[in-house]
């Protein structure tokens, strides 16, 4: 056997499998007679035997208990490092990949279309959605005008979610990885860090809001004056010992659910989806019955705006729905990557989001109107209505009803916190420190930080804080616009997976510079954010800050402005300054759609082969060479 075909069990970093050996042997031997052909077949048999023996030896070595030179090294390798498969690679290579960042293999792609229906049925039942109609009603719209804006707003939301989901459905990628295609390998950390910060803050705020249904459950069991029976030694002017106890109960009860793998968390949403209809319609029927069948819909608004005032009230109500959903649009690939087929996350989301959220908002409107008929006050929060029920009629039936509905609200907040905050934070943290943090650790980090930032102080400081959280949609919409333009217009659905996990020279997504920055994405992002900044500052800043009416109106349209400007400016920049790895020469005139259903079950082997190469320049010769035979969709 020639030397170049011998298999040596040495410390070489190059890996050689049987297929590569046989390909090498095909180049070395060119049998042109019977004797040479016999020798060739004999050599192939020897190769196979040696490869088998090598494999057996490696399995035996790997099964032996590893030896560490010190106790601290054992701690480091056994408990600090989360992905042992990337121990032998460089620091930069380990940043590219871990088990939570890799494309989702077939075994974990278990979400069918009905799982997405259950997911959104579960998501629509939360405290924020019940109150979303208050924006339009307080601006002067009547109930049916407000409901129309909700249908339209969530219709747009459904479309944006479906667009953002597509890259996850086809290539099985999470947002931190898919954003590398548009922002660049390393500059993609900017939107990722944005999501981490917002996820932690929102997790903390949502957990603090969930303290109220926990409080209602406790009062249903131990008495409506329970908060007066617990001495206040907390030492904070913004929260009592009782309030912190309720917050901590919810926070601690959430921790086990943070350890559930993302592809299995669908079971939580299935359970939640079963409970939600009973709680929603049960609450509505109960409220109407207590109001003796009367609903004071006319009490929901005082004045009716006309002309341009009505138009802007209509638009602001519509935009409130979209801003409320800005985080979930960005998060869409984190869930769509688990879909069984490309269409599992398509029609189910496009139809369910506007339908389910609009029904929930209508129930919220009717419960508020029934509450006014009973108490003469518009309680926009459903929890305030339940609190009033408990305080005015403390009997067995009321206690049981309040407990059950509050329990569903608490479960709803748990599901929302996982889907919108902890899971996205865990996924993003695993992209920042893939060697040391996986989704479970990232989710627990999110929960720990949520406790540390003391949300009761944030919520008590000013209503400006909650405004700032909602207004942050101007930054998220600009990210979503860039990602959408890059995938659908510039790349026409084409992603080269080996390149998106590589920082080597020639990787499409390094954009020709060692910093992995796509300057077009940065410029487009700033174009989307800049027009809305003056209005944002005026809305969340000091009362003395004044801006023009035009600046405020741009801010009211922030989601459309941010998304539209970033989308169009990125498309224009890529037209004049083409990006690498684009399957068409002219992104405006050329036609074609190059998305494919990626087979990624053996992707780890492909990735390891890729990082052993000095560069990927040869891959730039043809976009289609290795994947043209795959099925395009």
UniProtKB/Swiss-Prot annotation:
Transmembrane among keywords: yes
Recorded GO MF terms: nucleobase transmembrane transporter activity; uracil:monoatomic cation symporter activity
Chief location bin: membrane
Keywords per UniProt: Membrane, Transmembrane, Transmembrane helix, Transport
Keyword Transport: yes
One GO cellular component term noted in the UniProt record for this chain: fungal-type vacuole
Membrane topology label: Multi-pass membrane protein
Recorded superkingdom: Eukaryota
PTM statement from Swiss-Prot or TrEMBL: Glycosylated (possible); but there is not yet direct biochemical evidence for it.
Biological process annotations from GO: nucleobase transport; transmembrane transport; uracil transport
Pfam families membership: Transp_cyt_pur
Localization in the cell: Membrane
Transmembrane regions listed in the UniProt entry: 143-163, 173-193, 197-217, 242-262, 268-288, 310-330, 350-370, 400-420, 442-462, 465-485, 521-541, 559-579
The family this protein is said to belong to: Belongs to the purine-cytosine permease (2.A.39) family.
Function: Transport of uracil.
PANTHER family: ALLANTOIN PERMEASE-RELATED, NCS1 FAMILY PURINE/PYRIMIDINE TRANSPORTER
NCBIfam families documented for this protein: ncs1
UniProt-recorded name of the protein: Uracil permease
């Amino acid at each position: 056997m020639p030397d170049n075909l011998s298999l040596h069990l040495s410390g070489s970093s190059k890996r050689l499998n049987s297929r590569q050996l046989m390909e090498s042997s095909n180049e070395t031997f060119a049998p042109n007679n019977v004797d040479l052909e016999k020798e060739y077949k004999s050599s192939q048999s020897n190769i196979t035997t040696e490869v088998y023996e090598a494999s057996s030896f490696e399995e035996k070595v790997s099964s032996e208990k590893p030896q560490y030179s010190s106790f601290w090294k054992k701690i480091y390798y056994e408990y600090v490092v989360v992905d042992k498969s990337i121990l032998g690679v460089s620091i930069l290579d380990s940043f590219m990949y871990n088990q939570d960042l890799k494309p989702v293999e077939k075994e974990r792609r278990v979400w069918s279309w009905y799982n997405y229906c259950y997911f959104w049925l579960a998501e629509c039942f939360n405290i924020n959605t019940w109150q979303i109609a208050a924006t339009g009603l307080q601006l002067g719209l009547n109930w049916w005008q407000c409901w129309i804006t909700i249908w339209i707003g969530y219709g747009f939301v459904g479309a944006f979610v479906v667009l953002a989901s597509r890259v996850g459905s086809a290539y099985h990628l999470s947002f931190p990885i898919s954003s590398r295609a548009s922002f660049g390998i390393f500059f993609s950390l900017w939107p990722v860090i944005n999501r981490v910060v917002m996820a932690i803050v929102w997790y903390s705020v949502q957990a603090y809001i969930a303290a109220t249904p926990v409080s209602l459950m406790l009062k249903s069991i131990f008495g409506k004056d329970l908060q007066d029976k617990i001495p206040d030694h907390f030492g904070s002017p913004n929260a009592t010992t009782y309030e912190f106890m309720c917050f901590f109960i919810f926070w601690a009860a959430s921790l086990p659910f943070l350890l559930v793998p993302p592809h299995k968390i669908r079971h939580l949403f299935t359970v939640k989806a079963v409970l939600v209809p009973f709680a929603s319609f049960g609450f509505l029927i109960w409220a109407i019955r207590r109001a003796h069948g009367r609903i004071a819909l006319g009490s929901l608004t005082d004045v009716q705006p006309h002309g341009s005032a009505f138009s802007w009230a209509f638009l602001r109500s519509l935009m409130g729905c979209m801003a409320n959903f800005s985080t979930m649009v960005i998060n869409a690939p984190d869930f769509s990557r688990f879909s069984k087929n490309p269409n599992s996350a398509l029609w189910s989301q496009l139809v369910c989001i506007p339908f389910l959220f609009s029904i929930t908002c209508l129930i919220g409107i009717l419960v508020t109107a029934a509450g006014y008929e009973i108490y003469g006050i518009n309680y926009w929060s459903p929890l305030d209505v339940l609190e009033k029920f408990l305080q005015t009629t403390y009997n067995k039936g009321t206690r049981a009803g309040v407990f059950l509905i509050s329990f569903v609200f608490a479960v709803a907040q748990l599901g929302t916190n996982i889907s919108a905050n902890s899971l996205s934070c865990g996924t993003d943290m695993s992209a920042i420190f893939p060697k040391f943090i996986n989704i479970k650790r990232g989710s627990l980090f999110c929960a720990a930080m949520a406790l540390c930032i003391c949300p009761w102080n944030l919520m008590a400081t000013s209503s400006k804080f909650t405004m700032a959280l909602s207004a942050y949609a101007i930054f998220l919409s600009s990210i979503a616009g860039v990602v959408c333009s890059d995938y659908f217009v510039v790349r026409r659905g084409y992603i080269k997976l080996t390149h998106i996990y590589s920082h080597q020279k020639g990787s499409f997504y390094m954009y020709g510079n060692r910093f992995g920055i796509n300057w077009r994405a940065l410029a487009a992002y700033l174009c989307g954010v800049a027009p809305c900044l003056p209005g944002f500052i005026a809305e969340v800043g000091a009362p003395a800050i004044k801006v023009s009416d035009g600046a405020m109106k741009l801010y009211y349209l922030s989601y459309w402005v941010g998304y539209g400007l970033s989308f169009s400016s990125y498309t224009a920049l890529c037209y004049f300054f083409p990006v690498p790895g684009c399957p068409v020469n002219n992104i405006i005139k050329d036609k074609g759609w190059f998305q494919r259903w990626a087979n990624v079950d053996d992707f780890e082997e492909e990735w390891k082969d890729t990082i052993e190469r000095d560069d990927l320049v040869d891959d730039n010769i043809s976009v289609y060479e290795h994947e043209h035979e795959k099925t395009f969709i």
